[in-house]
């Protein structure tokens, strides 16, 4: 299996304090990986570097067989779905309208919106304003945004953050179902 993510001596420091220190990571295609560690260990920073949202202090990132750089970042991100820390969306718009914006940004056919709404069980609430959603519904909308366009790579940072035990179990099941839709 070829790797979908590779890092080589990846580093990030803030004010001379190393947060990520020479990380070498290989994630093969078709695998599910997770980062575990205490707050401040660099998990979110690593994921942001994988997406080109934070520039590393040193080292390199390869996504889908290409070294991540400014010239190819947008093209690689169009093949990647992500949810970093907490879902973002326009609260005054409906879920369907939010997904339409993301579809346009990712250059994805809007017909895919119905598919991802069904996967995350938001079809019946698709035309409600996101500001009326519970935290769990917002998390599911974030997963739907990440799944638009059937990405080759899915990066989720704390997708169960702030959920109660039932919500955590629901999100884990949703992630497992989402994974089967990627492979």
Task: List the predicted regions and their residue ranges.
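Conserved small/polar residues in nucleotide/adenosyl-binding loops
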Residues: 180-183
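Conserved ABC transporter NBD signature motif
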Residues: 59-69, 75-76
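Helix-to-loop junction immediately C-terminal to a conserved catalytic motif
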Residues: 51
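Conserved ABC ATPase "signature" region
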Residues: 100, 104, 110-125
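Catalytic Walker B motif of ABC-type/P-loop ATPase nucleotide-binding domains
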Residues: 154-158
């Amino acid at each position: 299996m070829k790797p979908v993510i590779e890092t080589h001596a990846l580093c990030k420091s803030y004010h001379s304090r190393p947060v990520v220190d020479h990380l070498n990571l290989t994630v093969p295609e078709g695998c599910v990986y997770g980062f575990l560690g205490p707050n401040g260990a660099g998990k979110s920073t690593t994921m942001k570097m994988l997406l080109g949202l934070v520039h590393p202090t040193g080292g390199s990132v390869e996504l889908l067989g290409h070294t991540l750089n400014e010239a190819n970042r947008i093209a690689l991100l169009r093949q990647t779905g992500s949810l970093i820390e907490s879902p973002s969306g326009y609260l005054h718009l409906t879920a369907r309208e939010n997904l339409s914006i993301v579809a346009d940004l990712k250059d994805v056919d809007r017909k895919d919106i119905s598919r991802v709404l069904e996967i995350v069980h938001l079809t019946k609430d698709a035309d409600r304003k996101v500001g009326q959603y519970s935290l769990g519904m917002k998390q599911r909308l974030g997963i739907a945004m990440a799944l638009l366009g059937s990405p080759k790579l899915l990066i989720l940072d704390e997708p169960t953050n702030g959920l109660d035990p039932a919500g955590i179990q629901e999100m884990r099941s949703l992630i497992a179902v989402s994974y089967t839709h990627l492979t």
